[in-house]
């Protein structure tokens, strides 16, 4: 089963992934972008080089294609539980070029069965971002991140409607423990 955690920077995805690692010890944990060695290189170029938005979008699509081919497909073949920190959903939300068709090509139409959305309000986001050093994307501001969050939700629910992906939307301001229990129950109801 292929499960993804989605949310903007500061929503608590990384915290939840770490908690899930203790609970699902046999699962394959991965991330997008950068879930492969090639992906890390592409991610570095996309985030650090002065390139066009279109070129950046294709770098992330290349990363996604390699990630699905070399990580996701083999794990699905072995019937492993795959838990990914982000997926094509974030890829489409963060990009100015959010073509579902190109993403379906890159993923070979392999989509997550379960999508966990961590949603945070403006005040919660401000508070969390004040506690960490900000990267290039986070430095674009709270309003930009809230716009991206809305796009993440839109893309997740579009996948639910078009392809039957299950979606669990959670308030990221809940305690990490409560969120973990809800996420684990959502994953376990099929595992």
UniProtKB/Swiss-Prot annotation:
Gene3D superfamilies: P-loop containing nucleotide triphosphate hydrolases (3.40.50.300). One of its GO terms (biological process) is dTDP biosynthetic process. GO terms for cellular component: cytosol. Its EC number is 2.7.4.9. GO terms for molecular function: ATP binding; dTMP kinase activity. CDD domains: TMPK. Phosphorylation of dTMP to form dTDP in both de novo and salvage pathways of dTTP synthesis. NCBIfam families: DTMP_kinase. This is Thymidylate kinase. It comes from Helicobacter pylori (strain G27). The lineage of its organism: Bacteria, Pseudomonadati, Campylobacterota, Epsilonproteobacteria, Campylobacterales. The gene is tmk.
């Amino acid at each position: 089963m292929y499960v993804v955690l989605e949310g903007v920077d500061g929503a608590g995805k990384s915290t939840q992934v770490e908690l899930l690692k203790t609970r699902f010890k046999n699962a394959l944990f991965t991330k997008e972008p950068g879930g492969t060695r090639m992906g890390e290189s592409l991610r570095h170029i996309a985030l650090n080089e002065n390139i066009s938005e279109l070129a950046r979008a294709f770098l992330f699509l290349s990363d996604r294609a390699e990630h699905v081919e070399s990580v996701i497909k083999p794990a699905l073949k072995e019937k492993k539980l795959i838990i990914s920190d982000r997926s094509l959903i974030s890829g489409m939300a963060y990009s100015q070029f959010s073509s579902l068709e190109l993403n379906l090509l890159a993923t070979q139409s392999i989509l997550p069965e379960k999508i966990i959305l961590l949603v945070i309000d403006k005040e919660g986001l401000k508070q969390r971002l004040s506690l960490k050093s900000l990267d290039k994307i986070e430095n674009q501001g709270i309003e930009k991140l809230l716009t991206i969050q809305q796009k993440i939700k839109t893309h997740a629910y579009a996948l639910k409607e078009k392809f039957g992906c299950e979606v669990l939307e959670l308030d990221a301001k809940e305690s990490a423990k409560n969120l973990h229990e809800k996420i684990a129950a959502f994953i376990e109801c099929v595992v």
